[in-house]
């Protein structure tokens, strides 16, 4: 009896948990993408940023994400991405000084779909409000960019 009750409850949870609301006409899917573009390292020779930047922008334009998070973005790459992706608002700062030094972890969003309410950055360390601080045995400073 105990097993039958448990089985009935589990079947009910599975049945009702798998139900899906019907989408309304106003609903739009949210396309999200993350992309580690690799920093601009002169030692990359044939894979140098100057050879990759157009293809990076083309790939993003092809997938057209509404929200885009990136990693390993240097300041010059951030400037190139802003120029190559004019339909996006770009947010982020360098991890070493909170301005331009060090890699960025920027957030890009489609300007025509979202309205920026608030944004900021914090360090992944024991002192999150101080940019440029290493934490928890990290080899490099780590930073996060957020937006509402």
Model-predicted segments: where are they?
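Short alpha-helical segments used as structural interaction elements across diverse proteins
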Residues: 1, 49-50, 139
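N-terminal, active-site-proximal structural segment of metallo-dependent hydrolase catalytic domains
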Residues: 6, 16-84, 95-103, 121
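Repetitive helical segments and hydrophobic/amphipathic motifs
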Residues: 11-13
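Bacterial N-terminal signal peptides that target proteins for export
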Residues: 1-7
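Structured beta-strand-rich core segments of catalytic domains in phosphoester-bond hydrolases
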Residues: 67-148
């Amino acid at each position: 009896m105990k097993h039958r009750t448990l089985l009935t409850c589990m079947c009910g949870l599975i049945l009702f948990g798998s139900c899906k609301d019907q989408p309304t006409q106003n609903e739009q899917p949210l396309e999200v993408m993350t992309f580690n573009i690799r920093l601009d390292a002169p030692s990359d020779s044939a894979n140098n940023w100057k050879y990759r930047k157009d293809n990076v922008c083309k790939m993003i334009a092809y997938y057209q994400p509404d929200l885009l998070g990136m990693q390993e973005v240097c300041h010059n790459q951030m400037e190139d991405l802003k120029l190559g992706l004019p339909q996006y608002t770009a947010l982020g700062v360098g991890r070493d000084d909170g301005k331009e030094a060090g890699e960025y972890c920027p957030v890009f969003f489609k300007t025509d779909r979202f309205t920026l309410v608030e944004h900021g950055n914090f360090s992944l360390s024991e002192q999150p409000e101080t940019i440029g601080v290493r934490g928890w045995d990290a080899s490099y400073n780590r930073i996060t960019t957020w937006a509402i």
